[in-house]
């Protein structure tokens, strides 16, 4: 059973419980793609822009930040596979610079100072530990809080915009619970088509968000109890990384239960090792502790065996995904 939930994980479960299982329980990691890499690089460049003095927050400097951020990470393992040649990478970079140029048509970063950036928010809602990172939090001219999220993609048409605020509503709820102040506004900045969608916040909205996330959490717990993570066929299936192993599309898809069992045992062993380390070693445990007779050498040996087994299963599934 997972111990924490983020808004993105909650949305993933709501979209398709099976996809949620593959990503978060089986821990079959989706390789970073070009769109994700671009979004991450754009986000980091915008964050670093506000490290500069206000009068230095120019478009040229923002473009240079994008180049520097990408230069620092382009040879990482998660990125080296993205491009077949320099022309592809150049076109990708030009598109990223265009997104940042669009940002300057929406805001003037020399005219304000964000209150916080890349802020961790976390809190307990009943038995749910909810956490996430918000891009930016400002105070408007009236001194009210505004939560801002950058989106490197395209804004939806107006009638579809409301569901996109789900994460920000939860962040607003956590901020209210943490500091006792209700944010006044939520803002989504879409860079691809230079659009800002905003939404006023009220207490009823936040209570509705609380009810919705708890309902999702209850459904997640039921799925764990019953070991049942059904597929939900939807319009996003064609873009899902896990489609080749999804039973909805492949009746011969590999069973990932053994992988889940491996992950659960590895987590239990790591928790035992962490508990022993926290008190400074086995010798500091009281005589009646259930961990007193723990053989750390044997535990670490078993951990190595399980991780090797897990890596073998993941490789086999990865080969299946790449077919």
Report the location of each language-model feature.
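Nuclease catalytic cores
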Residues: 11, 15-54, 93-97, 118
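Mg2+/Mn2+-dependent nuclease catalytic core
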Residues: 112-115, 119-215
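Short acidic (Asp/Glu) and glycine-rich catalytic loops that position anionic groups and cofactors
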Residues: 19-26, 43-44, 75, 148-152, ...
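C-terminal, charged and often intrinsically disordered regions of DNA end-processing helicases
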Residues: 1-36, 268, 273-278, 310-323
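Short amphipathic alpha-helical segments and their helix-coil junctions
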Residues: 17-30, 77-79, 147, 153, ...
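Metal-dependent nuclease catalytic regions and adjoining charged, substrate-binding loops involved
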Residues: 4-5, 175-302, 318
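Short, compositionally biased low-complexity segments
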Residues: 13-20, 40-41, 58-80, 181-193
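A non-catalytic, helix-rich entry segment at domain boundaries
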Residues: 45-117, 279-305, 309-312, 316-322
């Amino acid at each position: 059973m997972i111990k924490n939930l983020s808004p993105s994980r909650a949305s993933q479960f709501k979209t398709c419980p099976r996809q949620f299982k593959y990503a978060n329980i089986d821990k079959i990691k989706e390789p970073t793609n070009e769109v994700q890499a671009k979004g991450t690089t754009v986000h980091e460049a915008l964050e670093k822009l506000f490290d500069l003095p206000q009068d230095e927050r120019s478009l040229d400097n923002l473009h240079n930040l994008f180049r520097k951020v990408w230069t620092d990470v382009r040879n990482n393992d998660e990125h080296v596979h993205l491009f077949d040649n320099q022309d592809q990478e150049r076109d990708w970079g030009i598109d990223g610079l265009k997104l940042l140029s669009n940002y300057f048509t929406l805001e003037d970063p020399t005219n304000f100072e964000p209150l916080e950036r890349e802020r961790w928010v976390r809190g307990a809602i009943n038995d749910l530990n909810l956490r996430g990172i918000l891009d930016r939090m400002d105070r408007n001219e009236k001194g009210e809080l505004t939560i801002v999220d950058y989106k490197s993609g395209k804004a939806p048409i107006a009638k579809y915009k409301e569901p996109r605020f789900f994460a920000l509503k939860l962040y607003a709820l956590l901020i209210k619970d943490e500091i006792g102040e209700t944010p006044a506004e939520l803002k989504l900045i879409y860079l691809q088509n230079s659009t800002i969608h905003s939404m006023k916040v009220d207490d009823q909205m936040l209570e509705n968000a609380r009810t919705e996330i708890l309902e999702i959490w209850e459904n997640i717990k039921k799925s764990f109890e019953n070991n049942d993570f059904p597929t939900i066929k939807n319009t996003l299936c064609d873009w899902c990384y896990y489609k080749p192993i999804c039973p909805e599309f492949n009746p011969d898809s590999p069973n990932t239960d053994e992988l889940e069992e491996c992950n659960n045992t590895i987590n239990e062993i790591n928790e035992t090792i962490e508990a022993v380390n926290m008190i400074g070693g086995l010798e500091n445990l009281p005589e009646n502790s259930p961990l007193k007779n723990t053989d750390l050498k044997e535990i670490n040996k078993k951990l190595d065996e399980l991780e090797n087994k897990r890596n073998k299963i993941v490789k086999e599934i990865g080969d299946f995904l790449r077919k």
